[in-house]
Amino acid sequence: MEIAKGVEMLQLEFQEFIIHPILLWNDEMAVLIDTGFPGQFEDIQVEMKRVGVSVDKLKVVILTHQDIDHIGSLPDLLENGVSDIKVYAHELDKRYIEGDLPLLKDVHVENPPKGKVSDIVIDGQELPYCGGIRILHTPGHTPGHISLYLKQSKTLIAGDSMYSVNGKLGGIHAPTTLNIMEAQQSLKKYLNLDIESVVCYHGGLSKGN
């Protein structure tokens, strides 16, 4: 689903789950925000082809956090996809993503996905891609959870800091949130943003509420 020019909400299905990575692109490059479950690299390629963006244009991956449904296809992407790709994540989730520590919510997984994080992001940082991507450190769901704000299209990419149902925001998903108080504080960072669209990884697009 097109959110704005050069901003596409992808839809991936895995068992009973529907998840929504985001693809940003312009004439020069593309940015993928989150990579789905393990084994979904082919699904991502299909979605990119649907949008009309070649995988060869993919130069940047931004991971909102360490959970397996967000980092799952990172290894395949790095091995089979693109050369010299930059992978961004917050320092507090980096060691989990790289496999140095067991994933906080997926300790039962014997061989969890892992991949090299090339670049660390910090709160308030602006990445110079596709019109500018502002990083918001929004811990609670995980220690290093980040959300992204696209000023050009007034779009908030909320990751798992919130969920939505049928276009309505549902707030924090308590059962999968490690620190509820932190998560509540994180939501306050959104109050001063000029937001027209919110995309939740679980639930998809919400507008005007």
Predicted regions: what they are:
Residues 6, 24, 34, 44, ...:
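Divalent metal-coordination and catalytic microenvironments
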Residues 31-33, 62, 87, 155-157, ...:
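Residue-level marker for buried hydrophobic side chains located in beta-strands
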Residues 37-43, 49-123:
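Active-site HxH/HxHxD metal-binding segment of metal-dependent hydrolases
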Residues 116-139:
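Internal catalytic-core helix/loop-beta-alpha segment
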Residues 1-51, 147-159, 164:
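Conserved beta-strand hairpin/beta-sheet module of binuclear metal-dependent hydrolase folds
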Residues 38-39, 132-139, 143-209:
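Metallo-beta-lactamase
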Residues 2-8, 107-108, 128-131:
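Short Pro/Gly-enriched beta-strand edge/turn motifs at strand-loop
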